[in-house]
Amino acid sequence: MNMHAKGRLVGVGTGPGDPELLTLKAVRALAEADVVAHFSKRGSNGNARAIVGAHLRPVCIELPLVYPVTTEIDKDHNDYRSAIADFYEESVHKVAEHLEAGRMVAVLSEGDPLFYGSYMHLHVRLADRFPTEVIPGVTAMSGCWSQAGLPIVQGDDVLSVLPGTMSEFELTRRLADTDAAVIMKVGRNLPKIRRALEATGKLARAVYVERGTMANTASMPLADKADDDAPYFSIVLVAGWVGRP
């Protein structure tokens, strides 16, 4: 098939949650898309779909990509890995069918598509077969530190982005070796994160933000947060810029 007869794959960053933080380029891509694909868990259209809802054309085809599992199985369990691997292969096939038919497919991704985004799993499998574009989005971490009014780094400060899912030993080691940190994937890992921050002397300057930039957002010093599970959309920030003009 002629390459020019094929459709175009576009990864669209939808930003951290506030629809007003969508970029002009993202809005334009949504206005042009024949198909809009969005990842979600069972029983939900997903947050990315909610962010862009006002910009979807009535005639566009919606393609939900529904995760078979989320947090009910440990991510290191073989059953989880197998189910997710099969899911991404099936998702690639569904998207490729539309691309082969000559359609423009916009795949939504909260924050930025290439930063902890599920879109990446499609990108690496399809970018060598179809014309592809990635539209960057405002990341969740920048949305959260802007909302909190928290200067995060300056000068030679080192910023580490850490998943809360890593082991407590590794999390503590990396926190000890950085000036500033963003801890993502908080959820049920909050008690472990708190212990690691306390062990490294950083708990007092840690800020907890949930649902950053969204309508029902909340932020507070992490030391004041109850030690229960945090929502999926939550982040812990540790500023490196402390006590400096």
List PLM regions with ranges:
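Class I S-adenosyl-L-methionine
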Residues: N2-P19, L24-F130, M214, S219-P221, ...
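A contiguous loop/helix-start segment that scaffolds small-molecule binding in enzyme catalytic cores
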Residues: L9, L175-P245
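Short, acidic/turn-prone active-site loops that include or flank metal/cofactor-
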Residues: P16-G17, K41-G43, Y67-P68, V138-A140, ...
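General beta-strand structural signal in soluble alpha/beta enzymes
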Residues: H38-F39, L63-P64, V107-S109, V134-G137, ...
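Structural alpha-beta junctions
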Residues: P58-C60, F130-P131, T200-V207
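Class I SAM-dependent methyltransferase SAM-binding "motif I" and its flanking Rossmann-like core
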Residues: A101, G111-D177, D227, G240-R244
